Amino acid sequence: MLNDLPYLSAGEGPPLVVPLYTPQAANPRGLARWSTMRLVRPFTEHFTVYVVNRRPGLPPGTTMTDLAAVYAQAIRTTFEAPVNMLAISTGGSIALQLAADHPGLVDRLVLAGTACTLGPIGRRAQRAYIERARQGRRPSPALAEVVTESTIGRRLLEGLLWLSDSGHEDHTDAAVVLDAEDGFDLRGRLHDIKATTLLIQGDKDLVYPLELARQTVEGIPDAQLVVYPGRSHSGTFTDKRFAPDALAFLTDS
C-alpha cells in the first residue's frame, strides 16, 4: 500500500504517478489489470511507474478536493516531490485538482481524455451510472452512451456492459468518485496549476468534448494541446501515438 492506497509498480527510474479510476477501490484484476499494465508498459523503460487507486470506503459527499488531498499526502510521504504524473479520464480530473491545490508536488503533467469539467453527455451518463448503483442495479450499461452515438451500437453495448457487471460487485465507491466528478469544475482555478502540462485529446471524445479540452489548456500557463483527429474518448489513450507523444514530453530536458 502507498500511504494506505492500493498500487501497482513497474519499471526503473524516477517516479511517474498514475492516478487510476476503476469501479473497485483495489488493484485491477484480470483483463482490467492487463489493459492497465499494457497502457503504462512503454513508460516503464524510463520511469518507475506507480499506478495508484483510491482508498476503499469513501464517505458520501467526498469531493475532488478530498481525493486530491489523499493523493497529495501519499506523494509527500513517499517521494521526493515534485513528481511527474500521467492521468487519463477521471484520473485526469483528480490530477488537475491535485496540481491546482498542491502545485509544488507536480513537475510535469500528461493528461489524456480529460478536461477541467465533464461535458453534457459524460455528465448525463455518469449520473445514470450513479443512480443505477444506488438502486442496486448493474450500473455499467449507463456508460454505453459515451462510447458510441449510434442507437443500435448503444443498445448492443448496453447488453455487453450488463453482462460484464457480475452483479456481485459493490459499486458504492465508484458512485462516490463519479459523484465527486459531477461537482468538479476547475475552470476558475486553472491558472493555479504550475506543472508543465500536456493534454492529449481525441476530437470525437463524448465525455470531455474538445472545446472543454481547449479551455483547459488555455487556462493553464504554457500548457500544450495535441489533438488526435477521429479519436474517441478511449481511442485517445489507446492510439499508437499516445505513448511516444507522452514520453517525448516527459523526457524532454
List each language-model region with its residue ranges.
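Conserved HGGG/HGGXW glycine-rich cap/lid loop of the alpha/beta-hydrolase fold
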Residues: M1-P59
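Conserved acidic catalytic loop of the alpha/beta-hydrolase fold
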Residues: D66-N84
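Gly/Ala-rich beta-loop-alpha elbow adjacent to hydrolase catalytic centers
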Residues: A87-G91, A95
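Flexible "cap/lid" loop of the alpha/beta hydrolase fold
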Residues: L96, A100, R108-G136, D173
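Conserved alpha/beta-hydrolase catalytic His-Asp/Glu region
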Residues: P120-G122, P139-F184, R189
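Short beta-strand/loop motif that positions the catalytic acidic residue
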Residues: I193, L199-Q201, D205
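Conserved alpha/beta-hydrolase "acid-adjacent" motif
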Residues: L206-L212
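Catalytic active-site module of serine/aspartate enzymes centered on a nucleophile-bearing elbow/loop
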Residues: A223-S253
